[in-house]
Amino acid sequence: MDVYGLIGNPVGHSLSPPMHEAGYGTLGIDARYVTFEPAPDDAVAAIGGAGALGVAGLNVTVPFKQDALDAVDPAPLAERIGAVNTVDFGPLRAGDADRPRGHNTDAAGVKRAFSHHDIELAGRDAVVVGAGGAGRAAAFALADAGATVHVANRTAERAVDLADAVPGATGGGLDDLGDRIAGADVLVNATSVGMDEPEATPVPADHLHGDLAVLDAVYAPIETRLLREAAAAGATTIDGAWMLLFQGVEAFEIWTGADAPVEAMNAALRAELE
């Protein structure tokens, strides 16, 4: 039996175990998905220890995504983003590498969420609200897919710093957010606004329009105020569970080499969110 898992602190809230185990069960893969909660400064040691104990793959969540870079051979996109959320011990176990391979499937989660909803990103103008970890993954994902990206953040300097790292991107504060969105095709909320206060929104309703595709990274609640108001404006809306699903699907496929059973994994995830 193969063991996969998640390291983070805390991890008790994670929806990854039922999602991944639904995938293993559907395909008849003999595997389990478990959680590990090391001390906040023990990411490198924890990843090394997991590999030594025969763990086949790990997802990595806060606060370890940046520190995990020091424990892996990062894939190019993970290195550019500056964060790892998926560790594959396969090359190390096969003797083909000295360290496990590190990936960032958060970026793939963004791209595949749009693709699943038939949204073409190449040549589009995109606005990402938020310059934290989710914002970095979204900005790089959109640029990698061929979109022109503008990052908007309450602290403009953080948006500019992120934009400087993303090819062709611009960054700034929130003062001109309405004008930026007016000319955009794609909008991503990469902040946590709408999670703890469900009636809060990062984008005023009068900024939204019917030519937008709107992805909200918040997945609890599934239907945020932003998505309700975007739908009312005629926009295409994509809830955060799709992004969560497809980052997990991408990790599943890296680890197993099999096509993930997306429908089964999605059903398991949404059952947990109900």
UniProtKB/Swiss-Prot annotation:
Transmembrane regions: none
Catalytic reactions on record: shikimate + NADP(+) = 3-dehydroshikimate + NADPH + H(+)
Residues at which shikimate binds: 14-16, 61, 85, 106, 219
Active site location: 65
Pathway note: Metabolic intermediate biosynthesis; chorismate biosynthesis; chorismate from D-erythrose 4-phosphate and phosphoenolpyruvate: step 4/7
Record-listed NADP(+) binding positions: 130-134, 153-158, 217, 240
Catalytic EC class: oxidoreductase
A Pfam family reported for this protein in Swiss-Prot or TrEMBL: Shikimate_dh_N
Family annotation (SUPFAM superfamilies): Aminoacid dehydrogenase-like, N-terminal domain, NAD(P)-binding Rossmann-fold domains
Gene Ontology BP annotations: amino acid biosynthetic process; aromatic amino acid family biosynthetic process; chorismate biosynthetic process; shikimate metabolic process
EC number: 1.1.1.25
Keyword entries, A-Z: Amino-acid biosynthesis, Aromatic amino acid biosynthesis, NADP, Oxidoreductase
Entry annotated with the keyword Transcription regulation: no
GO MF entry, a single one: NADP binding
Gene3D superfamilies: Leucine Dehydrogenase, chain A, domain 1, NAD(P)-binding Rossmann-like Domain
Subunit structure as annotated in this protein's UniProt entry: Homodimer.
Function according to Swiss-Prot or TrEMBL: Involved in the biosynthesis of the chorismate, which leads to the biosynthesis of aromatic amino acids. Catalyzes the reversible NADPH linked reduction of 3-dehydroshikimate (DHSA) to yield shikimate (SA).
Similarity field: Belongs to the shikimate dehydrogenase family.
Protein name according to UniProt: Shikimate dehydrogenase (NADP(+))
Organism: Halorubrum lacusprofundi (strain ATCC 49239 / DSM 5036 / JCM 8891 / ACAM 34)
Phylogenetic lineage: Archaea, Methanobacteriati, Methanobacteriota, Stenosarchaea group, Halobacteria
Gene name of the record: aroE
